[in-house]
Amino acid sequence: MSGPMRSYLDFEKPVAELDSKIDELRTLAASGSDIHEEIEKIEEKAQQALQDLYAALTPWQKTQVARHPQRPHCVDYIEGLIAEFTPLAGDRKFGDDEALVGGFGRFRGEAVCVIGQEKGSTTETRLRHNFGMARPEGYRKAVRLMEMADRFDLPVLSLVDTAGAYPGIGAEERGQAEAIARSTDACLQLGVPNVALVIGEGGSGGAIAIATANKVLMLEHAVYSVISPEAASSILWRDGTKAQEAANSMKITAQDLLKFGVIDQILAEPKGGAHRDPEAMIATAGDAIAAAFAELKGQGRDAIRAKRRQKFLDIGRKLA
């Protein structure tokens, strides 16, 4: 996954400077200089700075982390967790939408259906996957996959990472709102367990369309909201530069959403975010997903469906 060079966010400048100093000293050490002790001291300082920084992230900073280009994406989780993955394409009505990846495979030996939004990691793949913003055919593909999973009694895993559904004219003409609604309804009608994991951005109805699940898990520095901070800023203040203020007011972090009962569990990220150790993050996600499915296993179809429906009905009632 990801490119060879680490990309730093603006607020990570102190860590970037320390890492740069470490690289310089390692170059000197390679030429014969005995400075290993000094390198170790700076490495310890950099690790502490990183830990302190990420322990006090603001909602806006978490939004930046959630969007980090080197953060593991849907296809990385599929590659790391799903054996024998067989992707399926098309909605059988219009065409295929690669913003939404879906198919069947084995998760720790058990057959499973996987659907998720893929943003892409290079210019070519970002364009091909439309930056993770699905069109109507993407959500109709998700419905097709969920109906197949239900028919064959297979649990469904959703990997959520989207800024939102694609708002283009063509998408609207093909029934974007209806497709999102039907995908959300398909989640609710499943008689098999479904687990959703928000791995980056959970943007509005585009995320909810595949995240209406029995268990909703969320990474520590992911965000989940009805609208992006930039869009909220433009609407509320008529000023797109107030995104930071909007993010602070919107309660979009995993920590806030757990308090509100919108999500069920927060998954700890490696020090400095998932992008600094994708393999460890994917392993942690695998354990949490397995535990969630184990908790739901053996429950009857009617019970699974009723509990899921009640879970989402209770969110508004508990916040009222």
Curated annotation (Swiss-Prot):
Residues 41-295 form the CoA carboxyltransferase C-terminal domain. It comes from the Bacteria. It is found in: Cytoplasm. It catalyses: N(6)-carboxybiotinyl-L-lysyl-[protein] + acetyl-CoA = N(6)-biotinyl-L-lysyl-[protein] + malonyl-CoA. GO terms for cellular component: acetyl-CoA carboxylase complex. Its EC number is 2.1.3.15. Acetyl-CoA carboxylase is a heterohexamer composed of biotin carboxyl carrier protein (AccB), biotin carboxylase (AccC) and two subunits each of ACCase subunit alpha (AccA) and ACCase subunit beta (AccD). Component of the acetyl coenzyme A carboxylase (ACC) complex. First, biotin carboxylase catalyzes the carboxylation of biotin on its carrier protein (BCCP) and then the CO(2) group is transferred by the carboxyltransferase to acetyl-CoA to form malonyl-CoA. This is Acetyl-coenzyme A carboxylase carboxyl transferase subunit alpha. The lineage of its organism: Bacteria, Pseudomonadati, Pseudomonadota, Alphaproteobacteria, Hyphomicrobiales. The gene is accA.
